[in-house]
Amino acid sequence: YVTNVLQSDSLIQIPAYYRILLFLPWDHSFAHTVGLYSFMYNGASLASVDYGQSGMEYLRNIPVNLQEVKPHILLSVPALAKNFRKNIEAGIKAKGRFTDKFYQLGLKMAYSYNGFGDDRGRGWKVLLKPLVKLWDILLFSKLRKQVFGGNLRFFVGGGALLDIELQRYYAALGIPMFQGYGLSEASPVISSNTPARYRFGSSGILVKPMDLKVCDEEGRELPQGQKGELWIRGGNVM
């Protein structure tokens, strides 16, 4: 775990003033490395959701604790991310047709401006920047405060493949969800997108130091672009 914390820090540096609210199981290596140890290593603060007397009470406590902690980073899995979106859009629709149309138009512009992530605001997209900024001031910043406390910078997603549409959606809200890739046996982080470099649908860039190659069934290394089995070597491998 110590090695993987140092490797993860090569991708995303966590300022000491950052806070995280952990609502993923603590017995998972993803929560251990990225949620607990990385924050401890950087002197940042962490909080957990009030468990309550049942699973349902635990889920009801999440929105309450988000407002109390006002986290800067959240760890998520696709099911939770979809549930957040469902609740956000239900709240928008409850405010009436005009608000919903305004919201949908803002999403459409942000999708165009963000592109695939790594081409955000480039070329003709720069013309959309004033409108994207306006919609952020009028709507999306308020949603971030109302739902997540107002300080959230980004999510780190793991546990399963993140739908590209879900990544586009949260980027449009101003809180991108960075997909990563890992294995429990690798402690678990192997790669991740980062605030400085991300692309929707990609699993990001490798942690450092770590060796990686793609091999065929016989263990022969394959050239770039070929599909095969992922082999890694590093101090994070159990």
PLM-predicted stretches and their roles:
Residues 1-2, 37, 55, 171, ...:
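Generic secondary-structure boundary signal with a strong preference for alpha-helix termini
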Residues 2-19, 23-140:
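Conserved AMP-binding/adenylation subdomain of ANL enzymes
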Residues 111, 128-238:
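Conserved AMP-binding/adenylate-forming
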